[in-house]
Amino acid sequence: MTKTVRSETDTFGPIDVPAAALWGAQTQRSLAHFRISSEKMPPELILALARVKRACAEANRGLGKLDDAKAAAIAGAADEVLAGRHDGEFPLSVWQTGSGTQSNMNMNEVLANRASELLGGRRGPGRLVHPNDDVNLGQSSNDIFPTAMHVAAATQVKERLLPSLDLLRHALESKAEAFADVVKIGRTHLQDATPLTLGQEISGWAAQLALSEQAVRAALPMLCQLAVGGTAVGTGLNTDPSFGAAVAARLAEQSGLPFESAGNKFAALAGHEPLVFAHGALKTLAAALMKIANDIRWLASGPRSGLGELSLPENEPGSSIMPGKVNPTQCEAMTMLCCQVLGNDAALAIGAASGNFELNVFKPLIAHNFLQSARLLADGMDSLREHCVDGMEANRARIAELMARSLMLVTALNPHIGYDKAAAIAKHAHRHGTTLREAALALGHLSAEQFDAWVRPEDMV
């Protein structure tokens, strides 16, 4: 009869583990003790941990600390994790020890058991590779987990967030160019203002994204400073003095990111300023995206009783009771996820500010929030671009209608008749329901020819 469990042992003694699982005793204890909510350790962080463990094995081999066979087996097991072959082996909750120790040990146990099998051994008692002595050699959760946090964050920013941001910015720049000839009324304080082109308005959105991109890129160098080599409290106890630099060099070579060993390991363990700063850049991007999405849905409001200056793609029915209704759903999704990012920033900052002495113990929260924000923003920008911006069109007739009705075109008269007379024309037109031209002639402040020559919206942009 096939056994469904096997016995694994740690310093607390034996514990039953599912026979098919690659994890060991400490992972099993964490599963038992932290049955909290449904948030699991982010997959991006798991992959980063695997990359870090592979680099550590290679560095230890290079330093003569780990024999070739074990190092190759650990690296091979890590490669399997990176290939997605063991996704189910990392079941731990985000809400665990604040150092991430249990997830570090989860990775150590999985790699040790799988490396043992790759060497022809078994998993569990009698394994050929030890999770602490071999996989975790020269390391502590206190330096390895924050190292993985930085690797995951920098990787997601480079590979997911920035490409999505770039594509959305280019899509908006394309629309700005396409609508460069569409003169429309501007709005400030939600009231009519002087004209601009729709292209100019959209160019502002694109420029907001460009500024946000600058902020995100400025944060990358700090994320590339790694804690590895600091071990328990930053002194580097029980590791080779060159270990941190060796690991960082391997990670840099494999990723194309300029990873390097942090100059001060005490700060790297006890504080998380790089992630606070980087998430601040994500918050900046979220603020810009929320403004852009709100502008788009307001300009598309209607279709008959709103502004109606933009037409958006009709992707799905909008109401379960009102037939034919179509809503700006992509904008709504974007604004919701931006709210989540702003909330993530507050929680992340509180966590980063709450370290004590030589260690911050809010690391899983910080990692979870950062990676969720990066994921939300990247996916949200892709969705907004594909299902909204690319198909967005200008309602030229409606724009012209609203332009003709606006009282703020009177601003063009200021240099010719002065502010007070121009204001009197606007108030007269509003009070009597007439056009500006009719009001100007009624008050006798200028001739019809002068009005037609001076009030030209296309000359006001």
From Swiss-Prot:
Where would one find the signal peptide in this protein? Answer: none
Write out the catalytic residues in the record: 189, 319
Residues of the site described as Important for catalytic activity? 332
The Gene Ontology terms for molecular function here are:
fumarate hydratase activity
Q: Which Gene Ontology CC terms are recorded?
A: cytoplasm
Concerning InterPro entries, the annotation shows: Fum_hydII, Fumarase/histidase_N, Fumarase_C_C, Fumarate_lyase_CS, Fumarate_lyase_fam, Fumarate_lyase_N, L-Aspartase-like
Q: Which residues bind substrate?
A: 99-101, 127, 130-133, 140-142, 188, 320, 325-327
**Which reaction is recorded as catalysed by this protein?**
(S)-malate = fumarate + H2O
The pathway to which it is assigned is: Carbohydrate metabolism; tricarboxylic acid cycle; (S)-malate from fumarate: step 1/1
Which terms are listed as keywords in the entry?
Cytoplasm, Lyase, Tricarboxylic acid cycle
Group of enzyme by EC: lyase
Give the EC number(s) under which this enzyme is classified: 4.2.1.2
| Transmembrane segment boundaries | none
- This protein's major location comes to cytoplasm
Cross-referenced HAMAP family: FumaraseC
Q: Which NCBIfam families match?
A: fumC_II (TIGR00979), PRK12273.1 (NF008909)
Q: What does this protein do?
A: Involved in the TCA cycle. Catalyzes the stereospecific interconversion of fumarate to L-malate.
Describe, as the record does, how this protein assembles with itself and its partners. Answer: Homotetramer.
Q: What else is known?
A: There are 2 substrate-binding sites: the catalytic A site, and the non-catalytic B site that may play a role in the transfer of substrate or product between the active site and the solvent. Alternatively, the B site may bind allosteric effectors.
Q: Tell me which family the UniProt entry assigns to this protein.
A: Belongs to the class-II fumarase/aspartase family. Fumarase subfamily.
The protein here is known as Fumarate hydratase class II
